[in-house]
Amino acid sequence: MLSSKNIDDDFITLDSPRFLSHSDYIAENKRTTVSEGDLLMTIVGTIGRVAIVPKELKGICLQRSVAVIKPNKEIINNRYLMYQLQNMRSFLEKEARGVAQKGIYLKQVSQLDIKLPEIEQQKQIVKVLDKVSKLISLRKQQLAKLDELVKARFVEMFGTFPANPFRWSIGKIQDVVSDVRYGSSRPAVEGGKYPYLRMNNITYSGELDLRDTKQIDIPDSELDKCTVRRGDVLFNRTNSKELVGKTCVYNRDELMVLAGFVIRVRINERIRPEVLSAFLNMDFSKRMLIGMCKTAIGQANINAKELQNIDLYIPPIELQDQFVTLKNKIDQQKQTVQQSLEKLELLKKALMQEYFG
C-alpha cells in the first residue's frame, strides 16, 4: 500500500510501502482499483502532486491520502490532465481544510474547472511540456550525481564509520565544538525584521535552500543566542524520523535568525564545518541517526546533548582542507547546474500559466 509520500510529480516511488494481508488487499482493491494510465494525486499533507500509473506498476493499493483519477481517454489526454492539475497546486493548497493535517475532499477534486481543447491540441501541449520536463529531470540527475561524487570522495579520503579503516583519531562531536545552541521558539511574523531560517531550509542532501523563508521579530537582547554566521553547522533536531539530522553549513554573510527545531553548532579548530556536515549527511550516519532518535506524537527528535555525544573520527586538518577544496569545486559545478534548473522550472511555470491560466 502506497501513501502520499510515494507520489511525486510525474514519478511514483516504492520506498517504505505498507504491506497488507491478502484479505485486506482484496478489500482495498475492491474499494479502488488502480490501473495503468490512472492519475494519482496527493490530497492530504503535501497537496497537489500528480503522477501517472505506469504499465509495469501492478498490484498496488493506496491510502486515503491519495486520490485516483480515471480520465476519459476519448476526450482528455492523461498527461495533459496531469500537467493541468499540477498547475492548480497553489489553488488546492488554499482550499485545503483541517487542523493537524490539511487536506482536500474528492468532491472538491471532481468539481475543479479545467480547460478542455481538442485532443490533438492537448497532445501538442503535452509534447512541449514533456520536453521541458525531461530537461528538468536531467538537471536533477546531474545534481544527484554530483552529490554522490562528494560522498564517494569523502569515503575515499576518510573511510566509513565506525569501520575507520585509516585509524583516524576517535572523539565525540562535543570534542570538536565551541558552542551548541537551539534556535528561537518564537513564531514567524509576516513582514518581520529578520529572515527566519527553518528546518525546511535544510535539504536532505545537506544544502542550504533559502527560496522559501519566513520573517521574525526578535528583541536585540536575544540576537546573539539565535542568529547564524558563516561557518555555523546547522542540525535539524526535530522532524519525521527519516529527516531528523539533516545538516548543512551556513555559507552566507546575511544575518538570519534560526528556528527552534534546528541546532546551531560552532566548531573549534579540530574540524572543518564542511567535514562535520558531510560526515552527518553520509549514509552510514543517517542510519545511525534514525536508530538513535526518539519519536513522540509523529515527530522524531535528537537533542543537543545527544548530538554532542555522537562518535566520529577526526582526520588530520590538512586532509580535511583537501576535502573542502574538492567540495568547493564540485559546489561550483552544482551552482551552474542549479541555475540552469531554475531557469527551466521558470520556463515550465510560464508555459503552464499560458496553457492553463
Question: What are the functions of these language-model segments?
Answer:
Residues 3-4, 23-86, 223-281, 303-304:
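A short beta-sheet element
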Residues 6-36, 171-186, 200-232:
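Sequence-specific dsDNA recognition surfaces
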Residues 16, 63-65, 193, 212, ...:
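A generic structural signal for short beta-strands and their flanking turns/coil linkers
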Residues 43, 59-67, 85, 98-120, ...:
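A short glycine-rich beta-alpha junction/loop motif
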Residues 85, 89, 93, 281-284, ...:
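Short amphipathic alpha-helical signal-transduction/dimerization elements
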Residues 111-127, 141-182, 309, 314-321, ...:
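Non-catalytic DNA-recognition/assembly elements of restriction-modification systems
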Residues 135-138:
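Contiguous mid-protein beta-loop-alpha structural module that forms a pocket-lining wall or clamp
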